[in-house]
């Protein structure tokens, strides 16, 4: 199991960082952020969007600042906000252009810089090797270029975010540390050292990735490193380029929710493709669902768990329900079996009643009461899916701890464990870490939750355990079987455990976006969603972060200039300046050339 961060007490202790008229840090509420999607030079449009964000609960808002035109626009935006009594702090997002950062600090409350491209050039996979002398010189250059911004922010009382993106580490960092968590951490620490040496402490850190597993590991590692140095700076949490809709919400919740549940995080942003106002309800639900962990009287410190024998990567024993993959089961109640017509029930389980073919998101099996084993409908289900009887394995939970390690329990092929909270489940696995008996994690929907709130709750409870390698199988006990399949497989995929559908990496859009990102993303999704699981397709609005943040993708569609698209295979641009009206067909052609395309059935 990966090391978790949680220490005694709940929130990681931090300094208070002043951002405009509010504070970020452990002594204050966790702040919700978003970013405008309008062109920053569209002053009126940007002000309207900022006002709309504030109205729905956003507490800090960021705008993109590509150059000096946007710097001038920020002055006007801030003036308009003051005139309209809109007090939300304004943040400038900077990439590649240090001078813009220095100038815009006059007009905004906070500046975000990316260590991967503020001074050094982004890694272009050139294979360049830095000698120790060259590396030292590059650090001196970093100080020369970065220290003026630090000095100005200190003088004006501005805040700063040192925001590392996994996909845009600098060439120098990549050469020394590789594409690693360590590289992400030291990319941030190099800039932090300049701030500390200049006695400037109004800083916040982020360690974003489109992969929740990478993101969680990076934040945990950074928090430990900062605390060892007694640099108690706040953390801004986010899964970058999470995508859209339910899948994007789940991916964000797996990453952000895991960290919030262990006391990490002082401000959050859910990067969802579409209108930024859609991000705020997700953030509010995340904070609501993770707040219960701070109130728990049974906190468990997962720092004590360094390894679990229930690793998701191991091959499961032959007698376990599902071999060689992390299994997904659904529970069928008597009500399901007695009131739903057999063909309808099979369709709800993803079985084509005409061909008998199972959908990629059909469960690996169903769990039913033993009293129903002789019914005709069970015989019909058994033709298509494996059946397990609820009473054949112990059902463990917080209320029967005396059974967890009993001889009778340990003699069974596997056990179910009902997960009510992350703490309780981690404690269960810690006590059993010397036993190889497989565990099926069992989940039920909590009462009175909306569909979105239920998805967020399950993403946190299951996602945190998946990221730490716990369990061998999951069982969802829902009345809505289609919802169980949708949520179950999406969470497994978001945690990089099991891929069943195409994964889409798409940015939320910002003032740099060169096309209608939600519309194009949806069109590409509709044309490719039938392709096999495991494939990753990125749709990115511009070339500033696009090529880096889609480094995990197999294929990429990236805005290069107005009306033009660059197409990527892995991190290599293979077609440049493709007219937008042809770009989707060209993407399909690339998929065909690389042998991953198939015609829809």
From Swiss-Prot:
Q: Among its keywords, does the record have Metal-binding? A: yes
Q: Which cofactor does it need?
A: [4Fe-4S] cluster
* InterPro entries cross-referenced by the UniProt entry: Dihydropteroate_synth-like_sf (IPR011005), IspG_atypical (IPR017178), IspG_bac-typ (IPR004588), NO2/SO3_Rdtase_4Fe4S_sf (IPR045854)
The cross-references to SUPFAM superfamilies, in alphabetical order and at most eight, read: Nitrite and sulphite reductase 4Fe-4S domain-like (SSF56014)
| Record-level GO BP terms | isopentenyl diphosphate biosynthetic process, methylerythritol 4-phosphate pathway; terpenoid biosynthetic process
Task: Kindly state which reaction or reactions the protein catalyses.
Answer: (2E)-4-hydroxy-3-methylbut-2-enyl diphosphate + oxidized [flavodoxin] + H2O + 2 H(+) = 2-C-methyl-D-erythritol 2,4-cyclic diphosphate + reduced [flavodoxin]
GO molecular function terms attached to this record? 4 iron, 4 sulfur cluster binding; 4-hydroxy-3-methylbut-2-en-1-yl diphosphate synthase activity (ferredoxin); 4-hydroxy-3-methylbut-2-enyl-diphosphate synthase activity (flavodoxin); iron ion binding
Q: Does the keyword Metal-binding apply?
A: yes
The enzyme's E.C. designation: 1.17.7.3
Q: What class of enzyme is it?
A: oxidoreductase
Q: How is the cofactor bound?
A: Binds 1 [4Fe-4S] cluster.
Which amino acids does the record list as binding [4Fe-4S] cluster? 507, 510, 542, 549
Per UniProt, the keywords (alphabetical) are: 4Fe-4S, Iron, Iron-sulfur, Isoprene biosynthesis, Metal-binding, Oxidoreductase
Pathway(s) this gene product operates in, as recorded in its UniProt entry? Isoprenoid biosynthesis; isopentenyl diphosphate biosynthesis via DXP pathway; isopentenyl diphosphate from 1-deoxy-D-xylulose 5-phosphate: step 5/6
Purpose of the protein: Converts 2C-methyl-D-erythritol 2,4-cyclodiphosphate (ME-2,4cPP) into 1-hydroxy-2-methyl-2-(E)-butenyl 4-diphosphate.
Under HAMAP family, the record lists: IspG
> What is stated as this protein's family in its record?
Belongs to the IspG family.
The name under which this protein is listed is 4-hydroxy-3-methylbut-2-en-1-yl diphosphate synthase (flavodoxin)
**Underlying gene:** ispG
